[in-house]
Amino acid sequence: INIKDQSICDLGSGAGFPGLVLAICFPSTNITLIESNGKKCYFLNLVKEKLNLSNVTVLNTRIEEYAKINREKDSIVTARAVAPLKHLLEYGIPLVKVNGYFIAMKSNIEKEEYNINNYLTKLNIVEKDRIVFNLPFEDSLRTLVKYQKQNQK
């Protein structure tokens, strides 16, 4: 995925991973961090100011509210352990531009995927890539899944 000069939305940013890391690595990329917890937003804004990250916008709102007014705004949307995969897709896919990507990082993705194929068709997305890896120092399995939003049929 070409990240440079794109717009990225990180859902449920928490402490800022991956949103803040992407903002540091790609200063020409606009990053929107969505976080409903005010204390976490305070932290994200503090880091933004200390590191002078002019490409970051921190929004203290719920994903559902943000999604109502920002349809097909971002080239890439990321989410980690914010909600079950089905809900992440439901909230995140409307934010993604056509041909853009939704990237989910989950720990027990196999348990969540048993009934999701019909849902992928309904949302007009296809799985493009999947990377399974162990977190360093934890020996804990994670899966990154990249979905691409398709044109309406």
Residue spans for each PLM region:
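Helix-to-beta-strand junctions that scaffold the AdoMet/dcAdoMet cofactor pocket
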Residues: F26, V96-V98
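Short glycine-rich, flexible loops that bind phosphorylated cofactors or substrates
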Residues: L85-H87
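Short glycine-/small-residue-rich Rossmann-like dinucleotide-binding loops
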Residues: A81-V82, S107
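Short gly/pro/ser/thr-enriched loop/turn and capping motifs at secondary-structure boundaries
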Residues: K40, V96, I109-E112
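Conserved beta-strand segments of alpha/beta enzyme cores
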Residues: N30, N55-T57, Y101, V126-D129
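Conserved SAM/SAH cofactor-binding pocket of Class I
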Residues: I1-R80, L89-E90
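Conserved beta-strand signature within the Rossmann-like core of class I S-adenosyl-L-methionine
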Residues: N99-I109
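Active-site capping/gating segments
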Residues: T32, N108-K153
